[in-house]
Amino acid sequence: MKEILITNDDGYESEGLKKLIKMLTKEFKAKITIVAPASEKSACSHSITLTKPLRFVKVGKRFYKLDDGTPADCVYLALHALYKKRLPDLVISGINKGANVGEDITYSGTCAGAMEAVLQGIPAIALSQFYKKSEKELDYKNALQITKKIIQNIFDKGFPLEKKEFLNINFPAKSKIKGIKICKAGKRVYNFEAHSNVNPRGVEYYWLAAANLDFEDEKNSDIALLKKGYATITPIMLDLTAYEKMKKVKKWLKANDE
C-alpha cells in the first residue's frame, strides 16, 4: 500500500485540503497522513520554526494540525516524528487557494511544503487553484481530476524528476480547461505597497500589500497559459546556481583585480 503525506499553507480547515483528502481517500488505496498548519501561512516561504517548540494537535484519524507551524515545519516534523519505519511514497502540498506562478513560487508556503519534502528525498507535488476575484466559490473539479491522473502516473511509472526537484502544478479558473501544458515559470512585475497607520498608543505600524501585480508578456509561461485555460506543470529544481553566469562573474572579478 502506498503512503501519502499531505500538507498545505491555507490551514487545516481549508476547502482545497478537504476536497483533496476526499478524492484521495476515494480513488487510491493508500495510507494517508495529513499535517497542516493550525492557521493560514500564505507567503511564509520556506521558513522553519527554530525559536519555540511545536506540537501536533490531532483533529482526526492520521490528521494533525501543527500548532503555529509552517508548511515546511509540517513536512519536516511529520517525516521525523510520524514515520518511524517507512517514509511516504509521495508528499502533496495543496490545493492552494490562488495560483503559485513565476517568482511567487519563492514566497509560496505551498511550494515550500514540496521543497521540504524533496530536500528530505521524498517525491513531491505542489497544487494551486487559480481563481478570479469575481468567483464566490472555487470549483476544484478539474483540479481533482488532473491531480488524480498525475498521482496515478507517479505510482505507475515513478516520479519523473531527479532528487531535489518537484512539480509545481496550477489549475485554471475556467470550468472547461483546454489541456495540460509543461512550461516555464513566468516573470512577475512587482508593485509592493506598505500602508502605514498609528495605533491608539501613538505607535506607527504597517500593513504590507501587493498591488497591481502583473507579469511580463511571455507566450509560454505558466501565467500566460493559465489565463488561457490550461493547467500548467513546471518542474522546479532547488539548485539555484546560475551556471551560465559563472564565467562572466570570474571575468568580472579578474577585471576588478587589475
Swiss-Prot record:
EC number: 3.1.3.5
Class of this enzyme: hydrolase
The reaction(s) this protein catalyses: a ribonucleoside 5'-phosphate + H2O = a ribonucleoside + phosphate
Segments passing through the bilayer: none
Comment on bound cofactor: Binds 1 divalent metal cation per subunit.
Listed SUPFAM superfamilies: SurE-like
InterPro entries, A to Z: SurE, SurE-like_Pase/nucleotidase, SurE-like_sf
Cofactor(s) listed: a divalent metal cation
Binding site for a divalent metal cation: 9-10, 42, 96
GO molecular function: 3'-nucleotidase activity; 5'-nucleotidase activity; exopolyphosphatase activity; metal ion binding; nucleotide binding
Keywords: Cytoplasm, Hydrolase, Metal-binding, Nucleotide-binding
Keyword Hydrolase in annotation: yes
Main function: Nucleotidase that shows phosphatase activity on nucleoside 5'-monophosphates.
Family of this protein: Belongs to the SurE nucleotidase family.
Matches recorded under HAMAP family: SurE (MF_00060)
Descriptive protein name: 5'-nucleotidase SurE
Originating gene: surE
